[in-house]
Curated annotation (Swiss-Prot):
The gene is RTCA. This is RNA 3'-terminal phosphate cyclase. It comes from the Eukaryota. GO terms for molecular function: ATP binding; RNA binding; RNA-3'-phosphate cyclase activity. One of its GO terms (biological process) is RNA processing. CDD domains: RNA_Cyclase_Class_II. It is found in: Nucleus, Nucleoplasm. It is an enzyme of class 6 (ligase).
Amino acid sequence: MAGPRVEVDGSIMEGGGQILRVSTALSCLLGLPLRVQKIRAGRSTPGLRPQHLSGLEMIRDLCDGQLEGAEIGSTEITFTPEKIKGGIHTADTKTAGSVCLLMQVSMPCVLFAASPSELHLKGGTNAEMAPQIDYTVMVFKPIVEKFGFIFNCDIKTRGYYPKGGGEVIVRMSPVKQLNPINLTERGCVTKIYGRAFVAGVLPFKVAKDMAAAAVRCIRKEIRDLYVNIQPVQEPKDQAFGNGNGIIIIAETSTGCLFAGSSLGKRGVNADKVGIEAAEMLLANLRHGGTVDEYLQDQLIVFMALANGVSRIKTGPVTLHTQTAIHFAEQIAKAKFIVKKSEDEEDAAKDTYIIECQGIGMTNPNL
């Protein structure tokens, strides 16, 4: 099954865990042996962290592959994939490492397995420096399913920094091929809704204050829509540890979804958390794109694998997206074109079209 070995420099561009996720997923799918060097070389703690290690081990187990150099602090790994298999797969970051990032690396792979898969993922569900599980379910899921597959995400327990302890179960069936997507029409915002949560010992008032501050902030800019942010106390048996946060979603007439989110930290008042999420949402609505800045890079691997030409309209192209494109071109040989949007209404905005000629990956098992 092995093709020529792909050599990846883990220190370029985004220079972090994302390079590992994109390169190992594509290596696994395409059956290409991989060596990644200089892993997280520029970070304050270089090399693999626990959450990267659990992602690598999961990919190895998904395809009965061989993995060398995979230990905490290691800056070089080699990976030799074999055949992707369905069934039950488990990954545990043993920290507050993000379950959503584990989904990012494993999901494209199990779409091309021989049978349905069940992914048991343990770690942080609402963690810093990663999508919150609510974002994954409320924004990522409905958009990524346009590629022609569906998945189910069951949140068993929520887990927060620093303990983790969350668990989600993702169920999905394989596909023959992925359809290309065309997301270029923004439409107008028709709904704004969200949830502000507290868990553990934090008082419910914190959730109400986050929600109220976010609503006030949004109203300054968008006056004609009801903003429905529900304050939520997470049930004791469904949350591990203490945490608070908020996610706000804007939905448009064409089915586009944008989000702003924020997590509470010790010593940061609730209003500030709510306002930060609201401002992030408003910033994502100001450009003429059809996806927000966090969805951009999560769609690149699927666009690269799809059978045909995909197009998405975005605001400024993030470093994560540029990095994902770089490795999708290097490893999968997909062809991307990024150009400024030529639409009249986008003229004054920083709006781009990302176009990809996908490789038409076909599931050999179906």
